[in-house]
């Protein structure tokens, strides 16, 4: 009620947000509660529900007061139904490193490739309202060369880390970075970075590719 700016549009059982980067979500009203089925489902207590107004308690325990718009032009904000997906890596990033092990020179390559795989991350406004933003994940190609001979090459996706991260963390993370760390008696060492988009939260993963091309993966301490 404090602004005339359109915030959301209700159509059927779906909420469409004015922010093009926020994904639409389904909802259901049961008695005095509205359930929002976003990436992280939430429930809000309804304080008032009439034909022209809707008040509810946010997760921050604030009363959010919404009113039905009487301005037909407000619907123009919702003309596009395409969610604006946020690209975390606009273009391919190439990195290479050279290491010497037992008088042999190795070159490790990393190619961070933007993909069309979508990651849904739930964020919360200062008022305690949740919205889902959508990001593109990356596929990272790694390879190791001795001179012109390729010793190892593989595409890495975050799905490969499903055994060491809970699904609720992995689902909201992107494969953000990768570094070639070196070569030793165990094999070729890489370190991957899994991060939550637009936050400082990240985890490191150590990857060792043995000389027989088998891979071991573990969380970095």
Where are the model-predicted features located?
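Tryptophan-anchored aromatic micro-motifs
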Residues: 1-6, 80-94
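N-terminal glycine/threonine-rich, aromatic-flanked beta-hairpin/loop signature
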Residues: 2-41, 132-148
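Short, exposed beta-strand/loop patches in secreted or surface proteins that constitute
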Residues: 6-10, 25-29, 44-48, 98, ...
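Short, exposed beta-strand-loop hairpins at the edges of beta-sheets
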Residues: 54-58, 194-212
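Surface-exposed loop/turn elements that mediate protein-protein interactions on large endomembrane-trafficking
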Residues: 143-165, 206-215
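Acidic, glycine-rich flexible loop segments
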Residues: 160-200
């Amino acid at each position: 009620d404090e602004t005339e700016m359109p915030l959301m549009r209700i159509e059927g059982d779906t909420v469409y947000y004015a922010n093009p980067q926020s994904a639409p979500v389904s909802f259901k009203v049961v008695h005095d509660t509205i359930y929002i089925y976003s990436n992280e489902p939430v429930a809000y207590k309804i304080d008032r529900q009439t034909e022209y107004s809707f008040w509810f308690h946010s997760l921050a325990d604030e009363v959010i007061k919404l009113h039905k718009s009487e301005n037909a032009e407000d619907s123009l904000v919702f003309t596009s139904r395409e969610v604006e997906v946020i690209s975390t890596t606009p273009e391919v990033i190439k990195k290479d490193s050279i290491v010497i092990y037992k008088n042999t020179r190795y070159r490790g390559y990393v190619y961070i490739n933007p993909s069309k795989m979508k990651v849904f991350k739930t964020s919360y406004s200062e008022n305690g309202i949740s919205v889902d933003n959508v990001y593109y994940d990356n596929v990272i190609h790694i390879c190791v060369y001795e001179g012109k001979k390729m010793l190892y090459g593989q595409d890495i996706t975050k799905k490969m880390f499903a055994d060491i991260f809970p699904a609720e963390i992995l689902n909201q993370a992107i494969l953000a970075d990768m570094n070639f760390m070196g070569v030793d008696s165990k094999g070729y060492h890489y370190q991957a970075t899994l991060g939550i988009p637009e936050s400082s939260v990240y985890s490191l993963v150590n990857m060792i590719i043995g000389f027989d091309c088998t891979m071991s993966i573990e969380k970095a301490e």
